[in-house]
Amino acid sequence: MISMFFHLLRAAIGTGPCYRRPLTSDEWRALYRVCVVQGVTVVVFDFVKTLPKSEAPELALLMEWLSAATAVEQTMRRMQITAEEFAEEMEKREIPMVVLKGLAFAQYYKNPLHRECGDLDCYMMGKKEAGDLAALELGGRMEEAGYKHSHLQYKGLTIENHRFFTDFDNTRRGILTERLLGELIREEQTPMGGSKLLCPSANFNALFLLKHAQGHFIDEGIRMRHVLDWALLLKQVQDGIDWPRLLEMLERTRTARFAGVMTAIAVRYLG
């Protein structure tokens, strides 16, 4: 069953053919549950919906899958629209809004709306407090969520407004990681489409993705969505990464071994 899951996922992202054998209703139901748990419901459905009727899931499951995929896409579209509106308001106040994590990594997907995420993470280039105040002026709500970030509520969108990038707990390695990420994010940001949202460089996203996934792995484990983020980043922008510099940073932040494991999994299972 897990083997078939990876066949479907590779076919969905265009890195391999799907081994096509007839699946029972129970097998399809199990595959669907795996996709939901691993955070790739919509990505895999993009391929499943192209299967001929003789190979596709039964209609009841197909409609359930379609409903779940549509709900994710609609949620992500609302998030994108509201985030762009909020970024425009920040731009009027000369507050840059650089997106982190989900919305940034989504740019590496064939359809960015198919990368699932629950809220918007952003970094305002040292103007966090001004951004918090602006959100309140715009009728939103704000609450501090520890030293790392605040939670903003704006027109139904939850925004994590970051003061720091990681839960570094004032450790020597954590302070170094923050400093390196700060250097990278200041070097380059590019507009996302025609919006005022800014996306960090490939160098920043690579280091941040790996540190973020490593944190999840240590705390509660990671899902295939994290590995897929890394695989698609490599597929889309590996030529734009300063590899000698990044590898040095990974060594200094003790992320190199984890990066190697993530890459090995991505290559072996996602092509």
Predicted regions and their residues:
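Conserved NTP-donor binding/palm subdomain of two-metal-ion nucleotidyltransferases/polymerases, i.e.
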Residues: M1-G118, M124-G271
